[in-house]
Amino acid sequence: MKEYYTISEKKLPIIALRGLWLFPNNIQHFEVGREVSLNALNASLLRNSEIFICTQKDPMLENITKEDFYHTGVLASIKQTIKMPNGNIRVLVEAYDRAKIVDFVENDSFLEANVEVMEYDKTKYHPTDKSLTMIRMIISSFESLAEIIKKPLPQDLLGGLLNEEDPSSLIDTIAMLISLNDKDSILLLETLDMDERIELVYKFVIKEIEFLKIKEDIEERTNKEISDTQKEYFLQEQLRQIKMELGEEYDIEDTDDYANRVKKLKLKKDSEEHVLKEINRLSSMNPNNPESTVIRNYIDQVLDIPWNKKSKSSIDLKVAEKVLNDGHFGLEDVKKRILEYLAVKKMTGSLKGPILCLVGPPGVGKTSIARSIADATNRKFVSMRLGGVRDEAEIRGHRKTYIGAMPGRIITQLQKAKKLNPVFLLDEIDKLASDFRGDPASALLEVLDPEQNSEFTDNYIEIPVDLSDVLFITTANSQEQIPDALLDRMEVIRVTSYTDSEKFEIANRYLLPRQLKENGMDKSQFHITRDAIYTIINNYTRESGVRELERNIGKVIRKAVVKIVKDDVKKVVVNNKNLEKFLGSKLVLDDEIPREDTVGVVNGLAWTQVGGVILTIEANVMDGSGKTQLTGKLGDVMKESAMAAISYIRSNQEALGIKGEFYKEKDIHIHVPEGAVPKDGPSAGVTMVTALVSALTGRKVKHDFAMTGEITLTGRVLAIGGVKEKVLAAHRYGINKVFLPKENKRDIQDIDPKIRQKIKFYFTSNVKEILDEVLI
């Protein structure tokens, strides 16, 4: 202990101040309101008015223990007490010496302790030259401090400080006048060496001057920037300027968290800098500014992208084969091609290569095949419907400058998957459209091109997203409607129509059990016969897929449920005899096509987006002036086929046995029934020639034939598409003789062998061969 201190010990009541520090040689006012403090105050007044005053560590604590305040404080004397209207006592105290608690005294009413008092004797302290110099610097700096705050200290106080002969009193008084935090205050109280204490106060004064200069500069800049409408945000703006001056970020709720989360994503340098720049903009922006909401939404969207999150994808061909077989009946060629595709992916370890495009009519299982691929490769599955999409922004997103802007659906689906390598189904890619808002097909080019999609940039996100690990699969009903540039990037796998036997197996294995489960039934309560299922297939649906078939099975089961619940029936059996009670009258009758030989009526074969159909073409010839009329809502290509057919007949009139100048003396009317349904395509050419020649010659056409093929002016028959669907349509209607172009002979290998055996195929390269066979 220094020679200028005299140590004594006293038993004193304790008052702990909240947010206030008291130093020796100073007078201070404060209010006392807590019961423990009031009791300590009264005990002091009853003794000699001496009290130990210290500071509470946490000013928010109401009930304190001996561990909740600093044990170093001051010995003070109570000079005055005034009772306040709110019940508190206002106290005036004078602090004398530093003191610290030695041990506590048990007391239930107030805090009390044995305190070691360090009484200072100014006559025994002899400052060093360094300390004297520093004291002068403190006084000079304190005068500068008064000028900076532009609130001059009272002359009596300033004069008292300048004339102060006691260094201890001087520096303790100055410590009371400057802003010190708890750490600095307790350090100053605990420092007993006068030379060290002088040096500490000098540092504190210099620090206070620097702080006030910065504050003054900040206030000046802030006042210039704040307009009349921004005055209410004055405090937030000040805080922003303070943080900017310190080189720190302004923490608007969670900008620090944003920055940390972005850094953890390990983005490319340019991408990370771009997002951090937006976070910095947010940190320096008033939270009430509408643009801060836009930036916050943008950052949230970026963070929602699964940048480095990928499923642990594995390709096990045995598992893949089992998944495909369990989920799909038939479609053997499709399954084989998908297994080949997956095998190549596993061998190369790369997803670069053609994108699979599953083309086929609705309801044949294209979407479920894509789901099975996801299951087989242990990936998440997401899908995006492209039907009717006209706006490029649906793919690429809107720029965030627009109100309500959001990322495109590619990004949102990745966010939904929470993985960066899902199986991504682009459904109905042939239904894309375009208008003044852009061409979404062009936007998809970048998505589907393996050489480009590693740098896919959404207009909203603005930084590249790597799509190279995404397994894209597309579906379409018609290959012809897919834009050429997109088609060039895809490998087409045709998912053809189901045969009746395949539909039966699908219904029996999958649809029936699923509908029973959904309606709370089991096999012990419901049975439908084989013949009844075939009747539903042939007389209530007539579709390429099985969606309508499942709906009808569900309808039958629901009515069976009503019967069981209402009539207390234990089991319902559905057969051909009672099927109409469940489904009503047959929707597709067996006599839709000619069942006898007729003049001018021919069974054509057509392919639609719902599969193959019989397209009956009728031709009639009557006296007239050579007019030609086409009805049945025919498209331009089909009309041109009719014109080509007439030209062929005119040029071969004599060989065909047609007399007279029919093109001058007769009017020709070609009609295709179901006039409300649009029809188009070149494959009805041979059918029109046959119907016209029959009508012009009066020769009947054999009703058990069906035909398809494009006609040329010379009578050549050209190849067409959709052979499998067309042949299945003929089989459904009971037609077992089919004319096909010779070039399509290879296509019948795709047809079920059981059906091939039931149909006699005629392959022709010239329409004359058809006429010779079918005209009677």
Swiss-Prot record:
Lon proteolytic domain location: 596-776
Gene Ontology CC: cytoplasm
GO terms, molecular function: ATP binding; ATP hydrolysis activity; ATP-dependent peptidase activity; sequence-specific DNA binding; serine-type endopeptidase activity
Organism phylogeny: Bacteria, Bacillati, Bacillota, Tissierellia, Tissierellales
CDD domains according to UniProt: RecA-like_Lon
Subunit-level organization: Homohexamer. Organized in a ring with a central cavity.
Entry's transmembrane regions: none
EC number: 3.4.21.53
Annotated protein name in UniProt: Lon protease
Subcellular location: Cytoplasm
Binding-site residues for ATP, renumbered to this chain: 360-367
Domain Lon N-terminal intervals: 12-209
Family designation: Belongs to the peptidase S16 family.
Domain of life: Bacteria
Induction section of the entry: By heat shock.
GO process annotations (BP): cellular response to heat; protein quality control for misfolded or incompletely synthesized proteins
PANTHER family: ATP DEPENDENT LON PROTEASE FAMILY MEMBER
HAMAP family (UniProt xref): lon_bact
Organism, scientific name: Finegoldia magna (strain ATCC 29328 / DSM 20472 / WAL 2508) (Peptostreptococcus magnus)
NCBIfam families: lon (TIGR00763)
Residues annotated as catalytic: 683, 726
